[in-house]
Amino acid sequence: MNANPKFLAATAEVDAAAVAPLPKSRKIYETGSRPDIRVPFREIEQQDTPTMFGGERNPPLTVYDTSGPYTDPQAHIDIRRGLPELRRAWIEERGDVELLAGPTSDYGRARLQDPQLTAMRFDLRRPPRRAKDGANVTQMHYARRGIVTPEMEYVAIRESLRREHYIESLRASGPEGEKMARRLLRQHPGQSFGAAIPAAITPEFVRDEIARGRAIIPANINHPEVEPMIIGRNFLVKINANIGNSAVSSGIGEEVEKMTWAIRWGGDTVMDLSTGKHIHETREWIIRNSPVPIGTVPIYQALEKVDGKAEALTWEIFRDTLIEQAEQGVDYFTIHAGVRLPFIPMTADRMTGIVSRGGSIMAKWCLAHHKESFLYERFEEICEIMKAYDVSFSLGDGLRPGSGYDANDEAQFAELKTLGELTQVAWKHDVQVMIEGPGHVPMQMIKENMELQLEHCHEAPFYTLGPLTTDIAPGYDHITSGIGAALIGWYGTAMLCYVTPKEHLGLPNKKDVKDGIITYKIAAHAADLAKGHPGAAVRDNALSKARFEFRWDDQFNLGLDPDTAKEFHDETLPKDSMKVAHFCSMCGPHFCSMKITQDVREYAASQGVSAQQALTQGMQEKAIEFVKKGAEVYHRS
């Protein structure tokens, strides 16, 4: 479906499903050292424990929130106007940027002057910004100068998840508050494989990690609407959602809707991979309405400008595309600068060849001209553009394996070493960098990927697509990849790129986006637990407590997808009265293991003994009863 100009100009509306608050949740804000640092969280209300289980109060639980203003009932959402400029004052007060008269890219100016696009164009009233001559506006540049920016303080508060507040509320919950706090804060020791995860995230720790290149805050100065977030091995594992139109499917309205839907369910960043019509206009609508960082693959649009002929690409066209997108506010670029001419023959014996779109484009260009890639040769010039807008590099893995057969081969690791070399070049310019990774990798080969990335890329954040652990399940590749994502996240990957059920089959719709997001939220959280990230088990413990106490609504609401959990429960037990029942349809009222355990505990309390003693005593009583009845195995009814 192509974009409808009249629809966009006159009737563009936010997706109603994306703005409704999640059940029993409310948006709250934590204020930092200045009034304009207001960090959003989602607070989930809980019911009190039933009297028969102690009657204690269960305080609200705070969770990370990526949905921006969309789930705040106090916010007025109008996608035709875009989101508030959260970071505008922070950017301007640093005094190192200038306002341009308008777009400076040839393509950007041409689109602005095309009257046929007026009806569909986002009505942006402000000009783009750029660093003043000689200035560097990256978060890494500030960090290396010892400056803690508002963005750094913001992410420090965000990563802490108001944990101290939750601990205090547990202790104040009643006479058993201290005991309750100990129980709900209990967490198994993790294995972080050498990561340096602190007990508490401070603004200074954030600054130090960015200065070292171990973390990035993707935040273009032309995306003031973004709510800062951090990607790094020593922080919570993040996930990315891919959206984007194609030549045969989807338009601007649908892509904005996918973005708002993705962030509702937990997408930390979104990549717009559009390759169809109106790429420039689609991206503008997405960025102006996105509270999360937006990434792109600029070579896709550059290819469209030469009618899909890779050999016709030039440095000048690519450079103009970088500037065009940087002035719109793209926060990170995937650039496949590691696909070098000498590496292409290494893929000859692969089962699936070069599967990266960007990688195949550059491979074709290199072979057509029999020259080294202009992305590699002009890399320092690319860095000059990046640091003028604070666009982060996502150095693309154009030679990633497209099947388990090709995993961990010579081509893949030759490119990885090159990405490590380019990382150091970017850091020389104080440009933020993360490294993209595979792909398709059997489970036993995943850890090697993480170890070599840390070695060759100097601990720059790793950002992987899965990896898919088997190739036998088209239609279920969110699962085949979720397995690999959980493992590589545990080993140290900082951000996981989601895979939807439509992977290898078609363009994902809204349902596919949600399925991919939830799958990857599970993988990321499982990785945080395995790494021993402080406080990672709090939500698990709260949900387990609700489950044991048959607080069904709390079970639904504390989960990643309350709607689906409630829907499944309602399929067999739809009545409201069943939301307090001490069983579900799996086992019924007489075989619920948790109900039986509670019966044992009640018996123990009535007898003044421990639960273990009660089990022993109960068995003895049954033995005596058995003997009194004649010690017969069977009795007539």
Curated annotation (Swiss-Prot):
It catalyses: 5-amino-1-(5-phospho-beta-D-ribosyl)imidazole + S-adenosyl-L-methionine = 4-amino-2-methyl-5-(phosphooxymethyl)pyrimidine + CO + 5'-deoxyadenosine + formate + L-methionine + 3 H(+). Catalyzes the synthesis of the hydroxymethylpyrimidine phosphate (HMP-P) moiety of thiamine from aminoimidazole ribotide (AIR) in a radical S-adenosyl-L-methionine (SAM)-dependent reaction. It comes from the Bacteria. One of its GO terms (biological process) is thiamine diphosphate biosynthetic process. Its cofactor is [4Fe-4S] cluster. [4Fe-4S] cluster binds at residues 584, 587, 592. Binds 1 [4Fe-4S] cluster per subunit. The cluster is coordinated with 3 cysteines and an exchangeable S-adenosyl-L-methionine. Pfam families: ThiC-associated, ThiC_Rad_SAM. One of its GO terms (molecular function) is zinc ion binding. Keywords: 4Fe-4S, Iron, Iron-sulfur, Lyase, Metal-binding, S-adenosyl-L-methionine, Thiamine biosynthesis, Zinc. NCBIfam families: PRK09284.1, PRK13352.1, thiC. Belongs to the ThiC family. Homodimer. Pathway: Cofactor biosynthesis; thiamine diphosphate biosynthesis. It comes from Bordetella avium (strain 197N). Substrate binds at residues 242, 271, 300, 336, 356-358, 397-400, 436, 463. PANTHER family: PHOSPHOMETHYLPYRIMIDINE SYNTHASE, CHLOROPLASTIC, THIAMINE BIOSYNTHESIS PROTEIN THIC. HAMAP family: ThiC (MF_00089). This is Phosphomethylpyrimidine synthase.
